[in-house]
Amino acid sequence: MTNTQFYITNFLNHIKLQKGDSSHTLRAYKNDLEEFFNFAKVEPEKVEPIVIRGFISEQILKGKSKTTVARKLSTLRSFFSYLYSEGFIKINPARVVSSVKIKRALPKFLTVDDAFKLVEAPSEDKFTVQRDKAILELFYSSGIRVSELCGLNLEDLDLKEGLIKVRGKGKKERIVPVGQKAKEALKKYLAIRQILRIKKKLSLDETPLFINNRGQRISDRQVRRIVEKYAKFIGVLEKIGPHTLRHTFASHLLMEGADLRVIQELLGHASLSTTQIYTHVDLKHLIEVYDKSHPLSKEDE
């Protein structure tokens, strides 16, 4: 094992233990670092700021988005900061490299009508359809992340109180309320889930809340496909995914007057600044309503 491989492995283990990041995030870190060192052609101890700047410039010339380039630079900063704090290197070369300035895009979200159509789309009494309905209702009702939904266990659900216990980023737990429609969908799903277990004599792991036909915990990819499938079914042309439903949940709450700090808690954001992006969405919505409704906003006829 080379020094580079040794350092990358140690860094990834450190991230996993300290932050509890998902396997998807860890793979992204690994890919970013391997790509950088393939470019740098030197061991971590010999990396200088000019090498990092050269890598960033190459990424931009390749046509990578500013968001992607900023993420790669963030990975390098975290990596070299770790090596410096552990005494593996004497100077942190990433510390003096300027950030990539990116314009923060407003999150996409569904209209109220489309959100209602989406959660009503699954209507058959089949296991997969009732499961899909419960998933869509829960997304719109709670705003949880796809990784949080896939990680839910039966014991995390309290239908009597209308609450779920969610494990978010860094394995931080929070309690999130569940709406009446989502509760009803979950009850139907749990009943048909039990029938499936008996009917197919599946050797189910009793823990996962959402499972596939084989009784295994549902994956992120499967959930993304479910959301995309029903979005197409109701005629939404833009590509949407689970995160769109998270944005929809937050945006609709704000439009109805919910306090920003309450939304922050529900979403599991560590910082209020992350949640504040939705105030821009709400402002855009208010301007659109004004333009359509206020007499003085209309051109002379």
From Swiss-Prot:
It comes from the Bacteria. The active site is at residues 145, 169, 243, 246, 269, 278. GO terms for molecular function: DNA binding; site-specific recombinase activity; tyrosine-based site-specific recombinase activity. Pfam families: Phage_int_SAM_1, Phage_integrase. The keyword Cell cycle applies. Site-specific tyrosine recombinase, which acts by catalyzing the cutting and rejoining of the recombining DNA molecules. The XerC-XerD complex is essential to convert dimers of the bacterial chromosome into monomers to permit their segregation at cell division. It also contributes to the segregational stability of plasmids. This is Tyrosine recombinase XerC. The lineage of its organism: Bacteria, Pseudomonadati, Nitrospirota, Thermodesulfovibrionia, Thermodesulfovibrionales. The gene is xerC.
